[in-house]
Amino acid sequence: MNTNSNSSNIVAASPDAVRVTSSQKIDIARVATRREHDLLGELDVPADAYWGIHTLRAVTNFPITGIPVGHFPELVRALVLVKQAAARANRRLGYLDAAKCDAIERACELIAKENRFHEQFVVDAVQGGAGTSTNMNTNEVVANVALELIGHAKGDYATIHPNDDVNMEQSTNDAYPTALRLALIFATKPLTDAVGDLAFAFKTKAIEFSDVLKIGRTQLQDAVPMTLGQEFEAFSVTLKEDIARINEAAALFREVNLGATAIGTGINADSRYALLAVEELSRLTHEPMVSAANLIEATSDMGAFVLFSGVLKRLAVKLSKISNDLRLLSSGPRAGIAEIRLPAVQAGSSIMPGKVNPVIPEVVNQVAFLVIGHDLTVTMCAEGGQLQLNAFEPTIGYCLLSSLRQLTEAITTLTTRCVNGIEADRERCQSLVENSITLVTALVPTLGYEASSRVAKRALAEKRRVSDIILEEGLLTADQLDELLKIEAMTRPSRAARLVAKP
């Protein structure tokens, strides 16, 4: 084995796995190595690493976020499924012999199905080169796992080569975008499931609070009565809408440019390859993947990413608004609105005893802000593409996969740690309604606008209830007032006010 006394960004995390980090360096002489070469020369690669020289150079070049591709299991799975589909297509075309294809397929299955070797995907998620570093990291890992499966040493590329065999008839410019689209499809399902659970939780609370009358508010001022159930029902409905919008946007990712190779012309690929590779990818993923009608357009266009990112931003905005509402409605406990109580999940202050803060809605707000920022980044990356290729897909992928993960976790946390445990303060809601001047709005059809305005002004000035003044002035009888102030009459379209005659 070769050794090298120079420092490197390579860390032996365990005897059988070498990890790369951007923050730690050790002397490579401490680990056994193998010599690999590329067009720039030779380097020593840790013998235990399943990645090779191309990955090593990428790790050195891009110590950007400290977040490796392996942080996103959906992307790792998608990358190797693309390699497996390509291997199958090339075997059907007679370009890849059965033994090599079988070894590559077995390697891909270990990574995709058994979640092994994900720690070997070590290049930074944000990188130059339009994803070439990620693609080569994948090629090298698949090749070296395949080599070991057939009894050969890592680095024996004369037997199975990362480029000639694993990357056969591919370019980064079609393999990586296809994998990214597939990864986003995989990551979307957990998000929509989480949104569905949250919508159901709000619906459940809407039923529980259907008889709790409260004051609705516009511009933070008292408006007209509604039920707390109606307020929570609105949260449920708006979230359910976004499940359909997200799925519609994600469906665009089923159209891929696999077979386009470098710029969409399909150079170096068999004319039959694209359709066969997409067919095999559909079979492996159980997704109805299709080949883009125009591969040149599909290679350069980022429209699907921009649309999907916008839908995620839409969801984030809704979640942030809902979180704002939960924080406002629970403000107090004695000097705020205090119509609802959020579950107490941790102490709120290091100086104020007994204080409990709405930390779950607060973290959802912050996740929403991150997603909104990611959307702007995706927009700029998409706009920054030039001519036949967009070099910024790695950052598009990083932003979208991060948004999906963060939204999924935030929504799940909001459901389980907050919404499921929300309680209504029924007495507080009733007190606010009874003392609200806005009750007079429900009486306008009966009393008229001018009389109602006079009652409201007097109630405000004298700090008295609207109902007391109406009875005092003889504008309505107690029975008539009770009829008009029934929960049904005040919280949905009703003819009651038209049918009650003035005394």
Tell what function each PLM region has:
Residues N2-P503:
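Conserved, well-structured ligand/cofactor-binding cores
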